[in-house]
Amino acid sequence: MSRSDHASGQMSTYRFPDELRVDELLLRGPIESDIETIAPAFRDPAVGGEASLPPVDADTLHVMLREQLPGMRAQGLLAAYVIEDLQQDELLGGASLHHFDPLRDVVEVGYWLFVSARGRGVATRSVQRLTEHATANGILRVEAHVRVGNTASERVLERLGFEREGVKRKYLRHGNDRVDATLFALLADDT
């Protein structure tokens, strides 16, 4: 969809990519064999807590993978990816595009990494690739919500040119609590 289509009032037809590659990283949909590796992240406060992942177990993730993710993807609600290092044959974390709004041409990006994958540019390159795909395919605005105080995630977004737009009170879950989130956004014109 072109920007002129957006101006004419047509709804966006953005489609989530099946997979994306950047350097040695492959962003692809999760498969059953990934669950045992990624499930601990959903219970580890050092990982899941920073990314506001729900504290679920492997059985719940299997059900989500089979029964929920395909429908959510088809409806434009969520495209979940694992981040795989193809050189090391290792899962490093996850990323997502979600909350696609076809009327406003907006999508939200999210990401999380295992502690061992941090500090290597994995989050920055993954978010950049997802953002590039979105803005090259008709998305006018990419948003991200980061728990207030999660400076590592804030730095990822700032490096990529996302602008800090404000704080949403009690917007994210952090364990059993509701916490404030900083809203970041990048416009297609900014890229």
Where do the model's predicted regions map?
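Structural signature of beta-strand start/N-cap positions in the alpha/beta core
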Residues: L26, L140-R141
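Conserved functional loop/turn residues at catalytic and ligand-binding sites
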Residues: D34, A46, A117, G121, ...
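Conserved phosphate-binding and hydrolysis motifs of nucleotide-dependent enzymes
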Residues: G93, N150, G161
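Conserved acetyl-CoA-binding loop-helix of GNAT-fold acetyltransferases
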Residues: Y111-W112, G119-A136, T151-R159
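Positions that flank functional sites
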Residues: D57, G149, L172
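Conserved active-site tyrosine of GNAT-family acetyltransferases
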Residues: L157, F162, F184
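GNAT-family acyltransferases
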Residues: M1-S116, H133, R178-T191
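Conserved catalytic-core motifs of GNAT/GCN5-like acyltransferases
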Residues: E143-V146, E163-A181
